[in-house]
């Protein structure tokens, strides 16, 4: 009997200790970040931070900002309100190299093992951050819930190399040579493990990806980056690649920066693919901006009319269909009339 009590007591202490361990508090310099607590600390010699939600969601979902974590934070703020953590480690000017991967692995292990963060993370890659997130996703696809990338670099020959139509950045191109250990430019040009290469691990893991780009981006031209990636993923049969295209970015940044008008698009994408509960996601309607984007960009649209006798009658649905055709004259619509009358 005494042995049983001792066993139960030790088990209780063990469980309490494990719970405390997995919910260890972050120590470091704390500050306010848009109403949330931000803690800055070191991972080895590298500075990192975590922004904590006021009430963590079940299963501790989190967003990992690769680079420029203070740029386009609208989606992060929305996710923090839903209980997500937001994290970043500054790996320096390593441009997504294998050396950067070692730093990232240390950071990931710290957050998941010591602080109980979810094993599957949402990756966010802004600009050169694309080099980091794809390096990680191909090396550790089982750890990625989804990827949301903002004007991402998908081939360092395009940026910083400037070997296509993009402007390039010679200082960063030299850094690529040093960081990746290339002896000459020929080796860099022959390198075949950019984000656009060796995509099978991402396809096999069926990792959902969304890119938001500007068509007039002269720094990271989409034709040399996102669209090559898109074509190769489609050839491999990857069904979860989405592109949000903006016609013009800011002239002051050669089209590379832009204002986020509809952060709900990226927010809903992330929520859909990183909701680890068994609850069916329900999103309140927040306008028709998504539909407008599809109608304007793809010139195609499918509109379904669902309802009872009012929907079945000719007046209302035909009026809406006519209005859409006038509003988007270049768009080819497929109207699905599925109203069912409630009376005979």
Which residues are covered by each model-predicted region?
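A domain-start/cap signature at the N-terminus of enzymes
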Residues: 24-58, 171-177, 275
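The feature captures the conserved acid-bearing segment of alpha/beta-hydrolase catalytic domains
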Residues: 166-227, 231-234
């Amino acid at each position: 009997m005494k042995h049983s009590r001792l066993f139960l007591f030790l088990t209780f202490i063990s469980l309490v200790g494990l719970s405390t361990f997995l919910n260890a508090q972050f120590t470091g310099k704390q500050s306010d970040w848009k109403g949330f607590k931000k803690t800055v600390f070191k991972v080895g010699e590298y500075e990192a931070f975590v922004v904590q939600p006021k009430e963590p969601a079940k299963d501790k979902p989190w967003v990992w900002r690769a680079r420029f974590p203070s740029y386009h934070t609208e989606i992060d703020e929305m996710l923090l309100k839903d209980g997500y953590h937001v994290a970043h480690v500054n790996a320096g000017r390593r441009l997504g190299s294998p050396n950067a991967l070692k730093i990232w692995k240390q950071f990931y292990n710290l957050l998941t093992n010591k602080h109980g963060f979810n094993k599957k993370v949402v990756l966010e890659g802004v600009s050169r951050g694309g080099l980091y997130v794809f390096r990680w996703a191909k090396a550790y696809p089982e750890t990625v819930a989804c990827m949301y990338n903002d004007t991402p670099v998908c081939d360092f020959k395009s940026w910083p190399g400037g070997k296509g139509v993009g402007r390039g950045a010679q200082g960063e191109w030299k850094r690529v040579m040093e960081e990746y250990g290339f002896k000459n430019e020929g080796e860099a040009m022959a390198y075949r493990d950019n984000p656009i290469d060796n995509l099978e691990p991402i396809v096999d893991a069926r990792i959902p990806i969304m890119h938001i780009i500007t068509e007039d981006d002269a720094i990271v031209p989409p034709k040399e980056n996102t669209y090559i990636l898109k074509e190769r993923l489609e050839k491999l049969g990857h069904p979860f690649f989405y592109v949000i295209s903006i016609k013009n970015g800011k002239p002051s940044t050669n089209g590379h920066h832009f204002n986020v008008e509809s952060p709900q698009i990226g927010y809903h994408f992330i929520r859909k693919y990183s909701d680890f509960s068994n609850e069916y996601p329900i999103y309140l309607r927040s306008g028709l901006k998504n539909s407008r984007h599809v109608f304007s960009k793809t010139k195609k649209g499918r509109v379904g009319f669902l309802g009872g006798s009012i929907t079945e009658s000719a007046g209302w649905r035909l009026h809406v269909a006519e209005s859409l055709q006038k509003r988007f004259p270049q768009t080819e619509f497929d109207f699905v009339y599925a109203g069912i009358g409630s009376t005979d």
